[in-house]
């Protein structure tokens, strides 16, 4: 939920409609949305409020990014660029971020609301106008924005980006939406006979196939019982719609957590190298700006830390491999941990562009490692062939496998609408090939860490099970023993083992999965 704002940009003033409230006489659906219950014409964008004023820059920025996302861009990459270009900072940047992310995340709820309020199917609403209405609906139903400000500003935005004719339509639909609370709209757009998963899909704005998959994942990873799974599923889906906290990592050898704390962050309770930023721009912290620290989810930190903690058998210096290193987040932490351990690290990435990003990330660590007589290298190769080309070379291997990202939906608002069940087949083949290659590349006594940012059973337990049952040269290690918090205590609620599954609604991290496999001698 975004913070309350002043009425000039949509805050709820004294006496305004409370969040989720409903004015007297409100009614959704039915008839021309531009006319009220006696046929009288409703408030129009063309009169009497057509004012000579500039469009709110925050809403215009959100709309600009939303249209870019519709064309295939990623919100988390596009938004920072637009904010910089439009010089939107501080509270205004926070408002823009919540408006954009919320409208994208919750379009599975807002779309049926818009269709009913408009009295027509979405296919008959221009895509550009629909995005404007999604932004408006989020202000009315998902943010602490005063009704008059939400309607006025959305109509003004429509007039600028969609045209005067569209502004009248947007005005009518917005006023119809404002007549009901979010709870009332849910009751109207979800049929009383809807199946539980269909109801949750609309209520929490997820495709129904994801709802079903997450229910199976909670049961399959033993995070829920038959008695608790429905409540746990609701909490998990709700966490996907909550803005995540900003987690930072101090890369060992290059920065200390204390430096991040001095810059305004709080020490992480989960990660010994982590911190949490409760406000402000991470890029304003010198260590982050200089690449000695970075934004990284605590779950990702725990994966790298677990691999570094597990005992291995090695003669002399250890050799570590990050098999799928791009764009470099985990590689940056692994590099620091390798420096701490006096080990060499090879970061492999199949994409040349992403390999360049990894080199940029590891530049400072590589220089420090070289000064201490060790190597941190970046190579560009297909991870599926490294096991054949370098059999038994590495002592610690991370397979941060490409996946659907269903455990990180809170950070990637558009991902839930782009992924389909068909993605699982192609990804599953790749995941199995990468894990098999990683095992081949591991020396006897070494360890492979297979990780995904998805709890989907087809990307986690099924992959590990299919690969390991075909070979007798690996044994599972209980990953739960290696995932410890900042004080060194075991992190609870990771499942029944030997793999470990983190959950957004339980641990506050992304939904990271980890399996640790030791190569037998």
Residue ranges and their predicted role:
Residues 1-521:
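S-adenosylmethionine
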């Amino acid at each position: 939920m975004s913070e309350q704002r002043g009425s000039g940009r949509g805050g709820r003033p004294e006496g305004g409609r409370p969040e989720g409230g409903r004015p007297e006489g409100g009614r959704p659906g039915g008839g021309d949305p531009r006319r009220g219950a006696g046929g009288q014409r409703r408030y129009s964008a063309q009169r009497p409020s057509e004012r000579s004023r500039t469009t709110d820059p925050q809403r215009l920025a959100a709309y600009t990014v939303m249209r870019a996302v519709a064309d295939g861009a990623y919100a988390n990459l596009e938004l920072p660029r637009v904010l910089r270009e439009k010089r939107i900072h501080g509270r205004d940047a926070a408002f823009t971020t919540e408006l954009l992310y919320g409208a994208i995340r919750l379009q599975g709820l807002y779309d049926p609301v818009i269709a009913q309020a408009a009295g027509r199917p979405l296919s008959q609403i221009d895509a550009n106008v629909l995005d404007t209405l999604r932004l408006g609906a989020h202000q009315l139903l998902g943010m602490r924005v005063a009704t008059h400000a939400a309607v006025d500003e959305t109509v003004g935005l429509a007039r600028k980006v969609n045209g005067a004719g569209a502004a009248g339509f947007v005005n009518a639909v917005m006023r119809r939406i404002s007549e009901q609370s979010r709870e009332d709209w849910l009751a109207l757009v979800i049929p009383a006979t809807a199946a539980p998963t269909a109801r949750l899909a609309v209520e929490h704005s997820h495709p129904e196939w994801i709802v079903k998959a997450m229910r199976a994942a909670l049961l399959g990873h033993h995070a829920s019982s038959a008695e608790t799974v429905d409540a746990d599923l609701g909490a998990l889906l709700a966490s996907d719609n909550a803005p995540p906290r900003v987690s930072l990592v101090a890369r060992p050898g290059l920065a200390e957590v204390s430096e991040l704390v001095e810059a305004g962050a709080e020490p992480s309770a989960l990660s010994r190298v982590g911190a949490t930023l409760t406000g402000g721009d991470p890029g304003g912290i010198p260590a982050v700006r200089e690449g000695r620290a970075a934004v990284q989810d605590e779950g990702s930190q725990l994966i790298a830390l677990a691999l570094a903690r597990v005992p291995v058998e090695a003669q002399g210096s250890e050799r570590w491999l990050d098999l799928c290193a791009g764009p470099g987040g985990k590689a940056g932490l692994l590099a620091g941990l390798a420096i701490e351990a006096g080990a060499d690290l090879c970061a492999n990435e199949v994409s040349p562009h992403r390999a360049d990003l990894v080199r940029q990330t590891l530049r400072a660590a590589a220089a420090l490692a070289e000064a201490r007589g060790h190597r941190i290298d970046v190579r560009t190769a297909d991870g599926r062939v490294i096991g054949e080309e370098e059999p038994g070379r590495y002592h610690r291997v991370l397979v941060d496998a490409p996946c659907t990202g269903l455990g990180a939906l809170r950070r990637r608002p558009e991902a839930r609408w782009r992924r389909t069940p068909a993605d699982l087949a192609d990804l599953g083949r790749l995941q199995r090939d990468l894990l098999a290659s990683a095992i081949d590349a591991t020396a006897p006594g070494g360890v492979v860490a297979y990780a995904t940012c998805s709890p989907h059973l087809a990307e986690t337990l099924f992959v590990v099970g299919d690969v390991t049952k075909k070979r007798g040269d690996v044994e599972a290690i209980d990953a739960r023993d290696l995932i410890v918090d900042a004080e060194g205590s075991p992190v609870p609620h990771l499942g029944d083992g030997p793999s470990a599954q983190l959950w957004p609604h339980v641990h506050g991290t992304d939904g990271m999965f980890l399996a640790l496999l030791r190569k037998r001698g």
